[in-house]
């Protein structure tokens, strides 16, 4: 029924101006003309978008909320880090970052960062 429809990721922010600055200057997204009051809409690849709306509080999630697919994660992580994005570092039995990236056999490579509201964002390159 919805298999061929466009999809958007939706995040919440307590400060839309701060979020706009972060996603434009650090992540490199462009604000869409579809942006409406109390919302930010960023155009992403293949007709997808990221919507961020303003709210007084943000419920913190302990999982990835948005995942950007990458053809070259090493390059993308390097550029994001140069733009001031701070990556999460892991050293557990199941996850170990090397140069900000976790390699998962049979799956791919991932790197995670948090936006100013603590939303967890991933960059992912499949195997």
Name each region found by the language model.
Residues 1-20, 64-66, 124-127:
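N-terminal beta-strand motif that seeds the catalytic metal site of vicinal oxygen chelate
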Residues 2, 68, 78-127:
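Vicinal oxygen chelate
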Residues 4-5, 34, 61, 105-106:
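A generic fold-level signal
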Residues 10, 38-39, 110:
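A short, glycine- and basic residue-enriched loop/turn
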Residues 15, 72, 115-117:
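Acidic active-site catalytic centers that drive phospho-/nucleotidyl reactions
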Residues 17-30:
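Amphipathic alpha-helical segments
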Residues 18, 73-77:
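Short, conserved charged micro-motifs
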Residues 30-64, 68-70, 88-89, 120-125:
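Conserved short beta-strand elements that form part of the metal-binding/catalytic scaffold
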């Amino acid at each position: 029924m919805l298999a061929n429809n466009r999809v958007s990721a939706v995040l919440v922010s307590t400060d839309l101006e701060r979020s706009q600055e972060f996603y434009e200057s650090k992540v490199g997204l462009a604000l869409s003309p579809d942006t409406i009051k109390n919302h930010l809409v960023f155009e992403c690849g293949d007709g997808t978008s990221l919507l961020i709306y303003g709210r007084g509080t943000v419920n913190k999630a302990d999982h990835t909320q948005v995942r950007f697919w990458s053809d070259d994660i090493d390059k993308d992580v390097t550029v994001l880090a140069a733009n001031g994005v701070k990556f999460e570092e892991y050293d557990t039995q199941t996850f170990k970052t090397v140069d900000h990236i976790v390699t998962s056999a049979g799956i791919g490579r991932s790197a995670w960062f948090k936006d100013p509201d603590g939303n967890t964002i991933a960059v992912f390159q499949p195997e």
